[in-house]
Amino acid sequence: MGDKMDMSLDDIIKLNRSQRPSGRGRGGGRGARGGSARGGAGGRIGGGRGGGAPGVGGPMRSRPVLSRGGRNRPTPYSRPKQLPDKWQHDLFDSGFGAGAGMETGGKLLVSNLDFGVSDADIQELFAEFGTLKKAAVHYDRSGRSLGTADVHFERKADALKAMKQYNGVPLDGRPMNIQLVTSQIEAQRRPIQSQSRGGGVTRPRGGTLGFASGNRRGRGGNRGRGRGAGRNPKQQLSAEELDAQLDAYNARMDTS
């Protein structure tokens, strides 16, 4: 203390700065916390899902796994790393159209997926059964997973094998619901032809509602009577009847 009394103010400030601890404890702790708590995507695909040790075995997965577990689980509705260049409706498929019945292979619709399952996970999971034409998760315009995916095999037998193996098997804690896409979708796309029994209502394509029978009154026709409407019109008399009435009237006037 006595030494500082003999020192100038600038020397005391320099001495105090040199005696301060280097680095910020709060910032360092935050960096250590962030490094230890957050895991990479490799642990999620390799060990977390397959039930093995994280980081061992690379991206291969032995079987559909139960859970990634821990704090490495991504938050729901996480945006994927890569979005498709051109968005299209999830139920739209360019294969439906002229010659859709000639489409070969087998197509599976996988639903009840965890929101963290990506396209790479689906491809990796089903590629062991055969060659894939397409395997993709459905996303909305915001990049959030819809929990469904399309898996298209080149051979229908491979699709049936995969459906038999994985249908109902939990993936990340949620059992997968796998269905084989058939021609029922085409039947749903066909226009419904209404059959009228005794003049029922028919709906022509691009037209308005009408009735099959021409004797039936249109909608709202003659339903409500306006002012003075609905009364029987006055009967018109012929010339002979008018002359007879005039003669009778003149006869009554003469007698009176």
UniProtKB/Swiss-Prot annotation:
PROSITE patterns: RRM (PS50102)
Cellular compartments per GO CC: cytoplasm; nuclear speck; nucleus
Name listed for the protein in its UniProt record: THO complex subunit 4-A
Entry GO MF terms: C5-methylcytidine-containing RNA reader activity; mRNA binding
Composition bias type Polar residues, residue spans: 186-196
Annotated function: Functions as an mRNA export adapter; component of the transcription/export (TREX) complex which is thought to couple mRNA transcription, processing and nuclear export, and specifically associates with spliced mRNA and not with unspliced pre-mRNA. TREX is recruited to spliced mRNAs by a transcription-independent mechanism, binds to mRNA upstream of the exon-junction complex (EJC) and is recruited in a splicing- and cap-dependent manner to a region near the 5' end of the mRNA where it functions in mRNA export to the cytoplasm via the TAP/NXF1 pathway.
Keyword field: Chaperone, Cytoplasm, mRNA processing, mRNA splicing, mRNA transport, Nucleus, RNA-binding, Transport
Compartment(s): Nucleus; Nucleus speckle; Cytoplasm
InterPro entries xrefs: ALYREF_mRNA_export, FoP_C, Nucleotide-bd_a/b_plait_sf, RBD_domain_sf, RRM_dom
PANTHER family referenced in this protein's UniProt entry, alphabetically: RNA AND EXPORT FACTOR BINDING PROTEIN, THO COMPLEX SUBUNIT 4
Quaternary assembly: Component of the transcription/export (TREX) complex; TREX seems to have a dynamic structure involving ATP-dependent remodeling.
Keyword RNA-binding (UniProt): yes
Species of the source: Xenopus laevis
Compositionally biased spans, kind Basic and acidic residues: 1-14
Entry's family note: Belongs to the ALYREF family.
Biased composition (Basic residues): 216-228
CDD domains associated with the record: RRM_THOC4
Gene coding for it: alyref-a
Pfam family, one: FoP_duplication
Compositionally biased region (Gly residues): 24-58
Residue ranges of the region described as Disordered: 1-86, 186-256
Coiled-coil residue windows: none
